[in-house]
Amino acid sequence: MTPDPTQLSTDACTLPDGRTLSYASGGDPDGVPVVVHHGTPGSRLFGALLSGPAAETGVRLLVPDRPGYGRSSPPAAEWSWEDWPADLGGLLDAESVERAGVLGFSGGGPFALAAASDDRVARVGLVSSVVPPAENTLATLASVPFALRAMFRISDAVASISGPSAVVSQYTDRSVSDPVAEAVAADFHEALDRGARAVERENRAFASASLDADSVGVPVRAWHGTTDENTPLSPVRSLIDELDGTFETVEADHLGTLLDRRAAALEWVARKE
């Protein structure tokens, strides 16, 4: 499935506090709405990896820039996934969505789970998800904010010179097509276009907070790679057991799991009870 950014359109809505929430739309405009939560860092352009499968599986794709990423306004103060349902509600209102599935990739996982507190959310899918409290290099660096921001600024600059492969190599060891590499790189650069404060804020939350499993009362399914070196498998398995959800292992790494299971994940999340 070849990513095609032209299959996405960018829209925006104004939230009750005056902030702008930007988002991409794609897939089947008459399909079942699914809100996709990009990684950390990430942006609405992540939707380019999913627009083709969404059209084929009858999914109406909505991919918001979380606050501080892409074209969305930064939050006024400290903000984390616990505050996300209110913003999501603004998006669902703007798009006149009465019922939707949600899907979270990598750092988008905690936000997808938080979204389940909105009674319009029917199902939650997680692909290569982070499970706070996270114990990894980024979580450690988040305790030194300027160091984390500097690392991503340097990574962004190096990738701008070296090309898409410099971004892709952070997420997978496999060889991917040029369109996939370009889509991954475009998502990364758009995420950091206005700096790295959003990625710093999210990683700080990942390191210090825990998920509230009791707030999730809808079906949950996770797909996770057995060779994922970005987000460990065992915390996801434990979380899914706690949620009484469904867990599927994939013989792939971080990005590879998404590429191999994106159509299946969209189809499951959009499935009506």
Name the predicted role of every residue range.
Residues 39-52:
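The serine-hydrolase catalytic nucleophile loop
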Residues 230, 250-266:
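Catalytic histidine-centered segment of alpha/beta-hydrolase-like enzymes
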Residues 123-154:
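Flexible "cap/lid" loop of the alpha/beta hydrolase fold
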Residues 54-74:
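Conserved alpha/beta-hydrolase
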Residues 216, 222-224, 228:
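Short beta-strand/loop motif that positions the catalytic acidic residue
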Residues 149-212:
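Alpha/beta-hydrolase
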Residues 229-235:
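Conserved alpha/beta-hydrolase "acid-adjacent" motif
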Residues 82-101:
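Conserved acidic catalytic loop of the alpha/beta-hydrolase fold
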